[in-house]
């Protein structure tokens, strides 16, 4: 759900 989208967002922001 939303948590998946957030996970990707955090990954992209961290990269």
UniProtKB/Swiss-Prot annotation:
Glutathione binds at residue 7. Optimum pH is 8.5 with 1-chloro-2,4-dinitrobenzene as substrate. One of its GO terms (molecular function) is glutathione transferase activity. Its EC number is 2.5.1.18. Keywords: Transferase. It comes from the Eukaryota. It is an enzyme of class 2 (transferase). The keyword Transport does not apply. It catalyses: RX + glutathione = an S-substituted glutathione + a halide anion + H(+). GO terms for biological process: glutathione metabolic process. Homodimer. Has a strong specific activity toward 1-chloro-2,4-dinitrobenzene and ethacrynic acid. Belongs to the GST superfamily. Sigma family. In A.dichotoma there are at least two isozymes of glutathione S-transferase. This is Glutathione S-transferase.
